[in-house]
Amino acid sequence: MPNTELRPILAIQEKEEITILNFFGPIAEKWWEDEKCFNEAEVAKAFAAVNPNKPIDIYINSPGGSVASALAINGILSRHKAGITIHVTGLAASAATLITSLKNAKTVISKGSLFMIHNPMSSAYGNAEELEKQIDVLNKCAESMRSIYMEKSGLDEKEIKSLMDAETWFTAEEAVE
């Protein structure tokens, strides 16, 4: 039976000179298992409480989840002008990498952490026309993802597409390169 209650795992800690946000777990509106998750609504609520003149440290350990939610979180966080440092503490995979690839942020990946990018996925059903529409949506999602990765990494579209097509895993050291 699906878990229809979102169980928040996003935490805020206000320090004198910095705000700390923890994003731990899958990114989803709801989760089908008994696992905690976070989404863009929670991030927007937390972000509204953040002092806009104070830098933010974000700690993330996430296997990914909803691309739409991760894109929204990227957009929400990109509005902060006082500086953001994102710390990958364990895993940033799939959609979570869209949060770690925030253009205006410094990204730090802890030794031993992993980073993984791949093409977006979907579970779809319907007739041929509906499935063709879903393919178009997936291609547009992949295009948006590539754009974010290119902006953050400086790699060109062909290189990013190749890495996504291969479902590429990086060590902390490889991801920084």
Q: What is each residue range found by the language model?
A:
Residues 1-97, 103-177:
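N-terminal organellar transit peptides
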